[in-house]
Amino acid sequence: MPPQSKSITYLPLLYNPFLNCIFNNPHHSKNPFRQTVQELSENHNDYTILVPPAHILHELFDPSTEKSSTKIRLHDLCYHNEDFIRSHIIKTNTTYPSITSSKSSSAIYVTMNGKQILIKNGIVFTGKGFKKSLRLKVLDINYFNSFCDYFPKGSKFMILYIEDSMFGSFDPNVPVSMQSREMDEIKIEPTLKKDQQFHDITFEKLLRSFPLLSNAVSDKFYKLFHHNNYQFRLLRTNTRKKLSSIKFEFQSMLDEAFKVVSDSVKIDTPDSEQTYHLINYILRLYPGLDLNRLVHEYVELNLYDKLWAQLIFQFDFPDNDKQNDDSDAIKILTKEKYDHLACISLNQLDVPTDKPWHINELHKRIYKAIDEFSKLSDASILNSSGKTQILKNTVNILTNNVKQISEIESMTEKTGSDGITVNADILIGLLIMVIVHARVDNLEAHLYYIKHFNSVDYTNDGYFCYILSNFDAVIYHLSSSMNDEPQYAGLVKSSALNHKFWSLIDSGDTDNLLVLLDEVQQGLGDSKLPNNHFLNSRTVQGESCLMMAVKADNSDAFNYIINYNYQWFSIDDILFDKNTTTNQSLLTVALTQESYNIITQLVEIILSNTTLEEQILYFNSVDNSGRSAGHYFHHSPNLIDQIGFLIDWELKDLNSHTPLFSLCRCYDHPDYATLLEKGFDCIYKKYGKESIDFDKHIDKMGNTLLHIILKDLSKTKLLTSETNLINVNQLNYKNLTPLDLYVKYNRLENLKELLKDDRLDFKFEDSTNFYSVFDFLGSSTAKSPTNTVLKEIEKLIYNYCFINYYPNTDTEKIAALNARFDTTKKDWALFFIKSNKIPTLNAETLDRLRKFTYIFKLDHTHSFFPDNETFWLNFPQEKSMVPIFAKFRINRIIEHVNMYMISLNFHPILTNEKIFENFFVKNRNKSTLELINDITNRQESDKRKFSNLVLGIAQVNEIDFFLRFSLTDLVNFQTTIAKFNKLVAISDIKQSDLRIVTDRMFNCLFSSNILPSVLLREYNFALTNQYKNQDSSYKELLTFTAWLELSTIELTKNIRRILLKLDDWKELHKNIKELNIELTKYEEDAPTRYATVVRDSTTEADTTDTTDATDATHASPNLANSTNGNLQQAHQLEAEAEEIADTSSSFFSFASIIENKKARYKKLLLMKAEEIKKIMKLNAELKFDHECIAAEISNFLKFKSNFINLGIKRYVRLSLCLSKIRKYELTKLLNSCKR
């Protein structure tokens, strides 16, 4: 914490007030921030900060003040409410597995002020302590680079961006009535569901739902429906009987069923009162419920198989007297009759319309009606209600009615939305087509059952009576009694002729076909074909003879029919000739059949006989899949040159595939490159390169053209043309960029082209799983380790990584690529690659990497590489976190480790040492203690080389001067780089702020309709992310400059440590001089014998202070007054002290005071010897340290220039990339507004 007297400095404000109050607060030492900031600074890795969107905090209000006259903005709470601040900071230092990399895990956390939240599946739920229960989506996650002085240098904070504040928010400008309408809509929905359920109520469900009712009637119903019930044995005997008797038996049983229900509420029946109240309750619960209908259907359900068997038996019974005996039981529509009329066509049923588009519409209705009418044969239709509904639906389809209309006018004529009037005569013809082609067996029995066993009385329902009368009319029209009439015979003849004609086309019998056409020509001459002619006949799918020739790939038949007589078929007949079930035109079918002769002939006919507008309409008409002729160009690529300019290349089918997209997906085409080239050249010519919106060619899975192209990307010119607005980093809905997809699916050619593009964000990670290209490469390699194409892809990716993100040096480079969690070791394993010719992958756990950095620093004590604690500051071991941070965190660790490897490459000396390999290969099996001992022994051995070295005061002063000068220079650099890092960190955030504010502006412009609101859905400027990695390139530069600052701090720390040793040396030197002075005093008073020794020792005493470092063999033998020395001199002083002790009787035979002087002198000699030992040890250490630190300072000067150069290069490259990405976004918006 800085001292309070320090002047307050202000940095630019952050747009997000919550982030600003924590990380950019000059009043951080005051309330309400003091305690929060202190706890965060003590251990920032124990907390995760939940950050609401900036525009929410700026624009909305505290919901607790909603009803107050004074409303408080959330912005104000950020700066004045401690509870608000601490409610957004959660403690994550709890035991929780941080293994998962998805948003599927859940955990409960406690905020700084003791409130509880639940994080589950990417959603934050407020819990105990919060006033409101909120459900907030996690928008994004990130690390926030701290730039303030009150947090640890280089610290990063885990951030969760959420969609609202933990207190909620409210906007006073939003009307309350709007909210109430939303509630009304929510309430209406269950009511609609209840009404829908009302129609599904059956008597059987009531019995299951209400046991009392079941107890009252179930036994009686069981006896009634039992096969031993003799009363109704007639329904179980297969004998000839009239249909009226079956009807009577059913009615009798129905009466018995009604009696069972009515008896259950009689007074003499047990529980009758409760049953009565229960029935009334049911009727109140379902108002309007017809209980009689439910009982009727319940009887049907139990008797249907018996009733239907009786009816079938009677209709199938061969009896020639049925006409007189039981005319209702006559079966008219037999299998033989269906066969005779199987090929009848609509144009032969006197339907008064000759417009081809009307005929197509009628055929569509017929086909749908056949599908509906065929349900009568479905075994699941077990009652009259289902059969009745099928008849209604069939007629409604034919008449294009969506509602049941009972007006008299509607019973005679019905006009669809397409202008076709369906009167009774047309309906008869349509029903004939439906009945004949549906081939429902026992249709007469179905109609009899509907009329006589129905639970609803339709006597007064004019519309349904009209429907039944039409079915009766059709059956009468096809009855056996009319077989001799010309009309019926004509139908049979037409059907036979149609069958003959269609068979000739299908079989390819062109000779007989020509004979048949000659006969037609002789009969009609050059006049037009009659409407009911077999040449105009169509199948039930609406296929004409031309369509049949195309489907049979019979180009000769097609040529004969269309060219035999130009009066037979008009251009409208050709343009509107479709298969009405698929809605495919002649050209579309010809393309799918790859009938090239027919395709050529068709296109020539259409281009020469239609206007430009008609051509555009025809070629862009779509089938039921939403596809036009352009979607099928891959069957005939030459058509692109011929009619490509007429195609709407942006037309999407049901899968959101445009014609261009479909071309790109034709992976099995033999000439895929030409197909791509033709397609793209065509759209460039048609639309112009600057007018193409490639976002219109994205399918419903989010795949762009870049995602979908298999190979030959260069042929498309998508990347080479600067005017093409295309996002090379766009994610599909599976969170794959084109780069990821090329790597995942081994698209080598495309990968080579994409890596050349400077808009490529190579290190892009999706915001859901945080996968990078290396994750997909690692996954593919694990599945196919021997794939040769994959090996080439590996080489491309690795080379790109080393060329663009590593120094251009000749030394071997090592990079961490990706990681996976090793469940056996309970740790993340990082995969490393070397830059040698044969890339090899090595996996190392985080624990081993921590050990590596520790051992490396221990071995290179004086290096400027940060120590282990500083390096792992933001990634401590065994620290828990929010689970969704796990993969994101390991990706940041990979980047951090790679920065370490880059620094090793730039080190002038360490680059030549294979440090990484020595540790992870040669010394892999050694324990940490063994490695520490090896390093200690080696360093001690290096120091022993200087064990006899003697340093003079002049030399020490030189070392001191050099170190202090270097320290001053480094401190000045550190101060400058620290200021620069603050500005870069602020700039990084402000660039994101700029993007957020700009997008917010667009959002407001869309909302206010200043810009077209329809574009809001397309561009989605709804602030889905707060701070995106693609917002700023300053983060890349900050990574290098922050590392440089940490390296400078480490180097200055090393210098200060040596300066402390120099101070110790000077202190020892001073102590020795003081000892010499005191020894001199004793020597002057010494006896003659000792004085001789002293005089000898002082002869050269004054010279030792100025000697250079010398070897011990050249040291002076006169020791007592020397202020420096070596170990030999120290030993001589110790020996002299012993000698003084031995000769004490000769020299000191005086009084006790003399004895004290002797002891004092001896003590001084021993003290001097000890000091000499210490200074000699310091001499060796200082010499060793001085050489190391001098070399490291020199290395650092070379390192920092090369290191920052790489950082600037990477920053500039990323800046250009991100600028182009943003330019693409804004240019696309501008072009869309113009359009």
Curated annotation (Swiss-Prot):
Listed Pfam families: VPS9 (PF02204)
GO CC annotation: early endosome; late endosome; plasma membrane; transport vesicle; tubular endosome
GO molecular function annotation: guanyl-nucleotide exchange factor activity; SNARE binding
Protein name per its UniProtKB record: UPF0507 protein DEHA2G04334g
PANTHER family: ANKYRIN REPEAT DOMAIN-CONTAINING PROTEIN 27, DOMAIN PROTEIN, PUTATIVE (AFU_ORTHOLOGUE AFUA_1G09870)-RELATED
Domain VPS9: 323-487
Biased composition (Low complexity): 1100-1115
Highest rank taxon of the organism: Eukaryota
Entry-linked InterPro entries: Ankyrin_rpt (IPR002110), Ankyrin_rpt-contain_sf (IPR036770), UPF0507/Ank_repeat_27 (IPR051248), VPS9 (IPR003123), VPS9_dom_sf (IPR037191)
Family: Belongs to the UPF0507 family.
Natural source organism: Debaryomyces hansenii (strain ATCC 36239 / CBS 767 / BCRC 21394 / JCM 1990 / NBRC 0083 / IGC 2968) (Yeast)
Disordered as annotated region, ranges: 1097-1124
UniProt record, GO biological process: early endosome to late endosome transport
SUPFAM superfamilies reported for this sequence: Ankyrin repeat, VPS9 domain
